[in-house]
Amino acid sequence: MELMFAEWEDGERFSFEDSDRFEEDSLCSFISEAESLCQNWRGWRKQSAGPNSPTGGGGGGGSGGTRTRDGLVIPLVELSAKQVAFHIPFEVVEKVYPPVPEQLQLRIAFWSFPENEEDIRLYSCLANGSADEFQRGDQLFRMRAVKDPLQIGFHLSATVVPPQMVPPKGAYNVAVMFDRCRVTSCSCTCGAGAKWCTHVVALCLFRIHNASAVCLRAPVSESLSRLQRDQLQKFAQYLISELPQQILPTAQRLLDELLSSQSTAINTVCGAPDPTAGPSASDQSTWYLDESTLTDNIKKTLHKFCGPSPVVFSDVNSMYLSSTEPPAAAEWACLLRPLRGREPEGVWNLLSIVREMFKRRDSNAAPLLEILTDQCLTYEQITGWWYSVRTSASHSSASGHTGRSNGQSEVAAHACASMCDEMVTLWRLAVLDPALSPQRRRELCAQLRQWQLKVIENVKRGQHKKTLERLFPGFRPAVEACYFNWEEAYPLPGVTYSGTDRKLALCWARALPARPGASRSGGLEESRPRPLPTEPAVRPKEPGAKRKGLGEGISSQRGPRRLSAEGGDKALHKMGPSGGKAKVLGGTGSGGKSSAGSGSKRRLSSEDSSLEPDLAEMSLDDSSLALGAEASTFGGFPESPPPCPSSVGSRGPSTFLPEPPDTYEEDAGVYFSEGPEPPTASADHPGLLPGEVCTRDDLPSTDDSGSGLHKTKEAAPAVGEEDDDYQAYYLNAQDGAGGEEEKAEGGTGEEHDLFAGLKPLEQESRMEVLFACAEALHAHGYSNEASRLTVELAQDLLANPPDLKVEPPPAKGKKNKVSTSRQTWVATNTLTKAAFLLTVLSERPEHHSLAFRVGMFALELQRPPASTKALEVKLAYQESEVAALLKKIPRGPSEMSTIRCRAEELREGTLCDYRPVLPLMLASFIFDVLCAPVVSLTGSRPPSRNWTNEMPGDEELGFEAAVAALGMKTTVSEAEHPLLCEGTRREKGDLALALMITYKDDQAKLKKILDKLLDRESQTHKPQTLSSFYSSSRPATANQRSPSKHGAPSAPGALQPLTSSSAGPAQPGNVAGAGPGPTEGFTEKNVPESSPHSPCEGLPPEAALTPRPEGKVPSRLALGSRGGYNGRGWGSPGRPKKKHTGMASIDSSAPETTSDSSPTLSRRPLRGGWAPTSWGRGQDSDSISSSSSDSLGSSSSSGSRRASASGGARAKTVDVGRCYKGRRPESHAPHVPNQPSEAAAHFYFELAKTVLIKAGGNSSTSIFTHPSSSGGHQGPHRNLHLCAFEIGLYALGLHNFVSPNWLSRTYSSHVSWITGQAMEIGSAALTILVECWDGHLTPPEVASLADRASRARDSNMVRAAAELALSCLPHAHALNPNEIQRALVQCKEQDNLMLEKACMAVEEAAKGGGVYPEVLFEVAHQWFWLYEETAGGSSTAREGATSCSGSGMRAAGEAGRGLPEGRGAPGTEPVTVAAAAVTAAATVVPVISVGSSLYPGPGLGHGHSPGLHPYTALQPHLPCSPQYLTHPAHPAHPMPHMPRPAVFPVPSSAYPQGVHPAFLGAQYPYSVTPPSLAATAVSFPVPSMAPITVHPYHTEPGLPLPTSVALSSVHPASTFPAIQGASLPALTTQPSPLVSGGFPPPEEETHSQPVNPHSLHHLHAAYRVGMLALEMLGRRAHNDHPNNFSRSPPYTDDVKWLLGLAAKLGVNYVHQFCVGAAKGVLSPFVLQEIVMETLQRLNPIHAHNHLRAPAFHQLVQRCQQAYMQYIHHRLIHLTPADYDDFVNAIRSARSAFCLTPMGMMQFNDILQNLKRSKQTKELWQRVSLEITTFSP
């Protein structure tokens, strides 16, 4: 992880190459744009370069000249010349020791050239924007292009001839001037824009590496001094004649001035300039900074940054084809990006150059920073962004954590704010330079104030709120650091500036008299105005350079050889052009205004107060990583005198309270208690470098020093008095109250207002001041001093840890929620300090142990959630930085034992007692130390790994500790702290990824990792996966009340928002007396009538009959029943589902606990569609399998017992916590900890893709694929691939959980990803899906996947695909016909048993409506095919299919066999008696299947008493396994009531126990009820039951009312009265005689060979499904479809085939078919064909009897009605072309009407109507002709 601290190690200083490049956009855009010549100052340091700067004490070595050759000792003269050359201006040497020998002059000049090529690289890169010129220069140097180098004194020149050019044309003359190991100017004739061109670089490199090859000469003035007068004249004349054109005019002008009688300057000043003699003593030795080019390049960079730019994405897939990230993830990335990736890259590289210059003590640091700052502030967009981000909601807790970041502009704004904060941080370090003079510090203070005002002024021109100005930290942290005096705070002899002896550069200028025009700082480097870049690089010395005297002796001539210091010309000349600095610095004088009226405090206006207490925190810059050197972020709320007023002591009590004062009371005492100082806020002030104290003389004078003192004293008592959020903004409440008035009276202008609350650094606590000193020393290269100080600070930090406890919130109430802003500040401050201490301490081996302790202390810091989003992200980032630093420190035995101890605590769970913020970074570090492989992914092992300190159990301990950390639950909810939850997830993801990669080959470990990561133990909302992949069974801890994806058990009695009491008014379908358990999740108001509360299995009969308004059945997708997936969910509220997906409802493995007394209503289908399975299996936060700690204290629910009692069977319960109608109040973020959320779903998807990439797979979801990075590797690692698949599936479950409309989606990139992975993985993935697709995928998605998988070559995969297809058939109503038919084909390809299961599943789904009739006819044909297969010879009676316990067929169709919805088992024909099971006493307890949904119940028009369902539902008591009634489905369309067959009981002894007669065929007698007996009532003993409504068989729809009969066990033979039109006497029939009176088998079946009972079952099933198809035809009958009256609609053949089937089964079946056909067939032609064919199949001799049979009569009537409708319909749309067809239809109609006695009369009426119609006479003539000629 790259470091971002201010004090980073040399090899790690951040430049662009290190930074995190998000989406690679910076790289792409910078490289692809042609005009970006400036390459962002990349390459300014050699990547491998160490700290070999020459500026260290003795100027480090880089040149060959410094080495001792062959062991020779360097002479003392050389050593002294070298030191003098580095430190002392040559003019001073001459002044002090007048006759300097020429040889010594040459040696000093020799050593004055810089020795380190890194400096050349740095300045070349600065000037050119990249290291390219340096590289080219290096090439020229190596190619020996530098010719004739000559050094004259301090002037170096040469000719550079690039090899490919002809010498005269391509030769460039280069000149370089230098002084004290710094190049002070350079020039070249090549005309390049930047002064540091390739040729200058080549010459400098030549001089550094081949110093001995350069010809050395003394300065020109030295040589001239040796000439005689005539020699001098000769020299001048020869010079003029050599270059007459260039020199002659200048020579004449100089002669004129010298000979003038006037007192010209040249005559009045002694001495003359010499460019080769080095600068004057008063000049600063400064590297030549090419300011104009640099400024232009900075402008270009900033312009490009501010302007709109195309967004370049490196991965099309991830950006465009995946869903957009949710707000929490987007905001996290937006806030983290400026901390990690540095943008704009160029400016950040310049800032890092400034930092490096500080370290080298290069005086260009401040000028460069000034150029940068000036340029940044000229762009209003930059200042606007900086201001808005630092005063924005994400930096205050008032945002409600709901802000959504909007893409690129938001990212740019945060990056910009981060960049500006870093600038302020660097200014703060600049003013804390220990060698800085007070005068210079005052100048900088004035400049910083000007800049702050400029920002505010820019902002005012924009649209920003003026009221937030004082919340904007801006330059305040740097301004506060100006009020500081090293001499008082931390004097270091020889380092800190002192008034008595000026140390820096040996201050030789003091030897000269002070010059009037000299710069004020008395020679201090930064204060000297810099020459403008426009000056000639090799310029004639201004007046004041070396001059040789004319005519005096040598000894006397040396003195006047330079201008005396009194000559002010030079100062004037240098000050003039560079006045830019001076004028700004002088602008505010000494900043006196700023302190006037420091008492003016203002209460924030109401709009500000809405920002809540922590706006103060806004000032924290997320990116200010200068560990404490960051902006002190706040200076302006409380008022304390900005300067240290003369009347205030150097360290007054701290009054600056960025947060409510009470929060700071412990600071000085707790943090670094030292000395008797009063409590101070320093610890919380992140930006303040500890400790600086101002003295009077280095502070700007103040206008009201008294008021400052008064304030300070007055404020101190207020600290800690009351917890009022508003105290954040003023020192105490009393001051705040009068703030407005004070402001009005005492404001002396805007600047005063802005800086009124400034808190001088010196007023911080002693330890804060010392931290500031340590940072400054480290930043400015004083590493020894910094190291000593940091040891003290580290020990103090460990001895006095900060107090981060949060007081419990007061009484309930939103406004009183506890503020954690103080703790947050303390935490971020502490981490900042810890990282700084780590950085400094780790540089020296003797401090490694202390550094390790500081790092562990920081990682173990327990903190509350941060008060703002920005701080939340920053804290997480800081932790990761500390962990990265800690990993680099070598560890000894004591450190390892500490780590083991922490790992043990993590494993045992004792480490975190209260943790909203989990110690995941600590766990990650422990895992890295104990378990990470010897060679890490980067190929290097941190020095941390010392094999001698390792112990055998370390790896296992590390693994268990890490896994335990993955399972930790946070105690905060996503709604309150979205970014904390996001950060926790990301840290868990990183840790889990490391674990999975490390243990990818160990399946047992992978299972443990996934169990914790996907939170399997808590059984809350988790997908049921890995059951087949990892064989071990999952613990069924259903009673763990963890509301979570990772929830910790909540306290008993805590009312969770998603639970509600069922004690309220019973909703329709609610069970009023079902016990005190929570009614699964909705508050009552959240249960609209539209939610299908139909009681389902498991409810007592009373519940099943609870009144419920008719017609409230919502549309198919809105229904639903179980969290997991209720098979019923799609079409009908009460359809049962297949066993293997199911709840314990009809699951034979859940015996006693799923009894009627279950208080948890665990099987009520409360909500739509199929809520995610993951939650459906008893895993909801309010899961019914909750224990007694549930929200309403329900007794230990049977759900828990069920879960544990069911052994291998999975406990699956309904999740009802979320309403799929989109009514969940917390649609985005849950208010309960550890709940699923949109952000969690997105995170887990990304994690799944990452795991897949690590496995070697390709995570692409589209055609834009990129080649896999794993070269010859064959496919992804299988175990990791499966892990990725499971994580993705879990994510999809979470996503569905929070997406109300997921069932209706048509495309999802997530789903396509999952199906793609399933195809790659093969059968293992499909097996997982068979178990748990229900909450994750929709049936069409599953069917599509199964279809794709069925084409694989692997037989296992094909088999798994068939299983998958079978698993989605119970939801056939959600599939289209092609999908269903393909699934049936897949099952058929496997074996007959699977085909049977498939057919039954489709049939069961169809009973609720929604399945196409064509599909059902296809199913019927499949049943018939099975019949033919089994009847065709191999009639093996499958015993498994006929026994209840073995349950081959039974188990397969358990959903159908469980008598759901009051019907008989699927094999039950409506005219047969439903299966009767024998109780121990052989009592007959039949199930009355009076109302099979084959005959749809009446709709709204029917006259039920409300709430009584038209069907009969009796509770069966079968001994083999408990079965439950379900509330039957309402038909999709209300229809007229249909006749129903009556049902007769059969003695149980007649059949094997629990088996339906339909299975048994002709071997057993079975009873049917012919229509003539329809009015007979049935009587038999019934156990005590609820009232039952019976609809007897009747012919006239709508006439009878159902009768409710209370059955009681007291009456052994209660009767069911049956009504047919009029009341008939009830016949009481005993069961036993009925058996003998049963009808014989149908005649078709009585051939010589006995029929296989199993094949007969298939035949019955084919008929049954065909009839269901007819019913479906009727349901869609009212559509105005062209096929309605077609002569041969598509279903004709199927209907006729069904008639043949009915005839095969017997007369009664034919009658039943007639009833169905009358309902389902609309075409009069088809109806007529059916009538005629039926008459043929029945005995034609008794045709009239048949016609009188009710069913047949109804069919004929329907046919006649259809003809009437047809004729009416055709008359409307009739054209002459249709006449023939119409006439034929009339003829057919006549034959139909002839079938009934009154038919012809009706037909004649039709003809009369036809005659009266408006049609033409021609039509009537043709019709009448046809009628007369047609004889029926």
From Swiss-Prot:
Its encoding gene is what? Zswim8
What is its pathway? Protein modification; protein ubiquitination
Compositionally biased tracts (Low complexity): 1176-1211
Q: What does this protein do?
A: Substrate recognition component of a SCF-like E3 ubiquitin-protein ligase complex that promotes target-directed microRNA degradation (TDMD), a process that mediates degradation of microRNAs (miRNAs). The SCF-like E3 ubiquitin-protein ligase complex acts by catalyzing ubiquitination and subsequent degradation of AGO proteins (AGO1, AGO2, AGO3 and/or AGO4), thereby exposing miRNAs for degradation. Specifically recognizes and binds AGO proteins when they are engaged with a TDMD target.
From start to end residue, where is composition biased (Polar residues)?
1021-1042, 1146-1161, 1435-1446
Q: Where are the zinc fingers (SWIM-type)?
A: 172-208
Q: Which domain of life is it from?
A: Eukaryota
* Pfam families in the record: ZSWIM4-8_C
Which stretches are tagged as biased composition: Gly residues? 55-65, 1121-1132, 1455-1465
Name the principal localization, coarsely classed: cytoplasm
Q: Spell out the molecular function terms from Gene Ontology.
A: ubiquitin-like ligase-substrate adaptor activity; zinc ion binding
Please provide the record's keywords in A-Z order.
Answer: Cytoplasm, Metal-binding, Phosphoprotein, Ubl conjugation pathway, Zinc, Zinc-finger
Q: Which residues carry this modification: Phosphothreonine?
A: 1141
UniProt-listed InterPro entries? Znf_SWIM, ZSWIM4-8_C
Sequence positions bearing Phosphoserine: 36, 48, 53, 437, 564, 1155, 1158, 1162, 1270, 1831
Locations of Basic and acidic residues compositional bias?
563-572
Q: Which residues form the signal peptide?
A: none
- Disruption effect? Zswim8-deletion embryos are smaller than their littermates and die near the time of birth. These mice fail to achieve proper oxygenation after birth.
Protein name, as recorded:
Zinc finger SWIM domain-containing protein 8
One GO CC annotation, please? cullin-RING ubiquitin ligase complex
- Positions of the region Disordered? 45-67, 516-722, 800-821, 1018-1216, 1435-1465
Q: How does it assemble?
A: Component of the SCF-like E3 ubiquitin-protein ligase complex which contains CUL3, RBX1, ELOB, ELOC and ZSWIM8. Interacts with DAB1.
Annotated source species: Mus musculus (Mouse)
GO terms of biological process kind: positive regulation of miRNA catabolic process; proteasome-mediated ubiquitin-dependent protein catabolic process; protein ubiquitination
Please state which protein family the record places this protein in.
Belongs to the ZSWIM8 family.
